[in-house]
Structures are given as C-alpha cells and as structure tokens.
Design a protein with these regions (language model features):
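Flexible, glycine-rich surface segments
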Residues: 161-251
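A cross-kingdom marker for long, charged
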Residues: 29, 213-302
Length: 302
C-alpha cells in the first residue's frame, strides 16, 4: 500500500512540475489614452490575449519551476488604431528581471524600447504560432521577445548558455522580413529588432555575452555571501568584457543600451564602496561608453 502511495505521489509531482514548465511570467499593460473611443474592450481583450499567449506557451524544452519563471513586463502605448482594418501602431517598452541569488532583489536583465510595435489584431482573435511558418506579425513580435529574453537569461547562468534559443530568435527575424512590417530588416534602423539580435550574436560581441555571465553569476549572485568579492568580479567583468566589446565593435549600441538600464544598479554597487582607484577606473570606463549618463557615473565617485 505504501508503495502504491509513493508511486501516486511521484506521479502527482510530475504532473505539477509539468504544469510549471513555462518560462515566462509576463504582465502586459495597454495604454490607449491617445485613442479617442467609447469602447475600450478591444484593448482589454488585446492585453488578455497577449498575456495568455506569452505565459501559457512553453517556448523551449527546458523545465522551469514556478519560482524560476522569468518576470517580464510589456507596456504598449497605442499611438494609432484603425478600427476598420484592425490595425495597431504602438511603441513598446519591454523589461525582464532576473533574481539575485540569496537576495530579496531582482536585477534588470533586459530593458529596451521598440518604436515600431505595429500589428493587426481583431477582437477575440486566437493567436496561433508556428515557428517554421511566420505568417502573423503580432505572434512574430511576441515570439521574438520571448526567445530573446529566455536566451539572455540563459546567458546569465552559463557562458553562452542561450546560444540555441538566440539562434531561433535570429531565424525568426529572417523569416519575419516577408511580413511587410517595420523592424525586421537590416539597415532599416540601427536600433530595430534585427539590429539587436544580429549584434548580440556577432562574433565580435562574444565579450558582451560573456559579460552577462560574469556580471550576474560571478558578481551579483556572489554579493550576498561576500559583497567585496562580488563587486571585484563585477569590476573585472566591466573592465575586461564590456571594454573589449565596445572596442571590438564601437558602432554597436548594445553596450550603450546595457549601461542605460544598468546605471542605477551600477551606481548602487560602487557609491560609497570600494577604493577610490577602483571607482575612478569604473567611472572612466562607463563615461567612455555612455557619456549621456554622466550624472549617474559621477555618483560612483562618491
């Protein structure tokens, strides 16, 4: 009897684990204040449909427990809505966070703005996605950010750990170029979706990908146990990998985008901590990469 109970418990646990295989936990917000309409139901349905599509789908073969799901936010601002054509033109702010080991703190893993998040959507549409046949703009957009975020997250836990997922993201981008929407093509815009994933996978940006692992896994994750050692690892990662990535591909915007959303965290890591010599080195490094955040970098020297 006990043996049967054990088997039943094991089967139950397997079932529970299976229910938590999804990788993402995305919160969607749709701001339609610029659109004059008396019926907001299409925007509410859009928000619910996107959340369901992103959160209920299993994007990889990897097993994620409920507590391991990547926390994300997708904030859409609708700038144009053509009801007759079911056409939306939006800007999107996409953010993903990563928990820090042994700390009640999450770190921004990705944060970027998509200025051409345009698509067609009719209320109560069912979103279907086949990776081998990209035929819908909205699902292509959502799949792009799902794969990109999962790939970057895996890079932060193992050196180049997200390569397979990121290659799928690149494959999607190449196939989505036939959809006729902006953001997918090379040379169209230096900050578009193609540019980001193409740069991220470029051989010259391997130091930037190594930075993801060293900064998070060897640096931030270590700080709860030993703040001094964690900060030293972060300094080494910045001075070695971030500097090399910027030097090897000075026209790449990835180091600038990264330092834009890391400025507050970097300031907190160094302000009032470490040696003055270390602070000066990090200040000079960050100024050389992203002088537009000078006010934040100045606080590092305090």
């Amino acid at each position: 009897m006990n043996h049967i109970k054990t088997i039943l418990i094991d089967l139950f646990l397997l079932a529970v684990l299976g229910l938590h295989a999804q990788e993402l936990q995305v919160k969607v917000n749709v701001n339609h204040s610029q659109i004059q309409t008396t019926d907001a139901s299409v925007f509410e349905n859009l928000q619910q449909t996107i959340e369901q599509f992103m959160n209920d789908r299993q994007w990889t073969d990897l097993q994620f427990q409920s507590v391991e799901r990547i926390q994300c936010s997708l904030n859409l601002t609708v700038t144009k809505y053509v009801r007759e054509d079911h056409h939306f033109e939006c800007t999107a702010l996409i953010q993903a966070n990563r928990p820090v080991y042994n700390a009640a703190y999450t770190s921004t893993l990705y944060n970027n703005r998509d200025a051409s998040f345009n698509f067609d959507f009719q209320q109560f549409d069912q979103l279907n996605f086949m990776e081998e046949n990209i035929d819908n703009q909205l699902t292509a957009l959502l799949a792009y950010y799902a794969l990109l975020i999962i790939g970057i997250d895996l890079d932060s836990f193992a050196p180049m750990g997200g390569s397979d997922i990121l290659q799928r993201c690149m494959f999607l981008v190449n196939n989505a170029q036939n959809l006729g929407f902006p953001g997918w093509k090379a040379f169209e815009d230096s900050r578009n979706r193609f540019a980001f994933i193409n740069d991220y996978l470029d051989e010259g940006m391997k130091p930037f990908r190594q930075l993801q692992y060293d900064y998070y896994r060897k640096g931030l994750d270590e700080m709860a146990n030993n703040a001094e050692r964690g900060r030293t690892e972060i300094s080494t990662a910045l001075e070695t990998h971030l500097t090399q990535a910027h030097s090897d591909k000075p026209l790449s915007l990835l180091p600038q985008i990264w330092t834009n959303y890391k400025k507050d965290e970097l300031t907190a890591i160094y302000k009032g901590k470490g040696t003055q010599k270390e602070k000066e080195r990090i200040y000079e490094l960050l100024m050389g990469i992203n002088a537009s955040q000078n006010s934040s970098w100045e606080m590092i020297k305090q």
